[in-house]
C-alpha cells in the first residue's frame, strides 16, 4: 500500500501513483493531511466547488503534517500526470519550492493554499504561482489574543501561547499576531510561548508544564484547535476549567462543541471550505485564460476572513 492517500466520493483508497502516466481528472489538489477536520472541511469545499464549476478534481494528502518528504514526492509524481493545474498547501514554506518551480516550467497552472510558499526562493528557482489563498494569520492570532485581553479586563494577568510547528509560516504568523497584541497591553504578561507541533497530546504535555510553572496564569492562546483541545484537558486536569481561558484557532466542529460546553472559551474560526473553493476557482479561471502567469508577475492574493466563536 502506497503511503500517499487519495480521497474521493467519501471513500478512502490507496493510490499507487506510478501505475499510470495520465491524470484521472483535470485538476489535482495536494492538502497537508486529512487527519485534521480543518483539511477535511477544505476538501469538502473543493469538491462542492468542482461540482459548481463542472470540473473534475483529484484530492490528495500526506499521511501527516510532519511528513515533508512524502509531500514532496507526491507533488513530483502529480506534476508528471498531465493535470492542467495543481493547487497545493505546502507543509512548510520551503519543502515544495523546487517541484513547484519545475511544474511551473512545464506549463501547469498552480495555486498556493493556506501556507505560503517562499516566493523569493521560488522565483530564484525559476517558478511562480497564479494565486495565493489564505486567512490573514497574523490577524487571526491578534483576534484570539485581543479577545483574551478584553476578557481579562483592566486587571489583566499572565498568559501563554501554544505555537504550531517550528518553521511553519501559518503557525508563526498566528504566534506573531498574538504576541504583538499581548505586548501592546500593559496589563498582560506573556510568560510562555512554546510549540506543540499541531499535536493534541504534545499540547496537553506542554500546557501541563506551563500551568505547573505558572500557577497564576489566566489564559492560553493556541495556534490551532487540535492543540487547544489538549490544553483544555490540561486545564481540566489542574482543576482550573473556567478559571484559565483557552482560546483556539480554526473553528473545527469538536472545538465548537467544547466552546458550547464551557470546556474552551473561544475559537477563531477560519473558513477552510471557502479557502479551498476559492483556490480551485482561481486555478480553473487561470487555465481558461490559456496563459501561465509570467515569472515576473506577482500572484493574485486572496484573503478569506475569520470569525470569533464564543459561547
From Swiss-Prot:
Pfam families: Peripla_BP_4. GO terms for cellular component: ATP-binding cassette (ABC) transporter complex, substrate-binding subunit-containing; membrane; outer membrane-bounded periplasmic space. Keywords: Periplasm, Signal, Sugar transport, Transport. The keyword Methyltransferase does not apply. Residues 1-23 form the signal peptide. GO terms for molecular function: monosaccharide binding. It is found in: Periplasm. Part of the binding-protein-dependent transport system AlsBAC for D-allose. Belongs to the bacterial solute-binding protein 2 family. This is D-allose-binding periplasmic protein. It comes from Escherichia coli (strain K12). The lineage of its organism: Bacteria, Pseudomonadati, Pseudomonadota, Gammaproteobacteria, Enterobacterales.
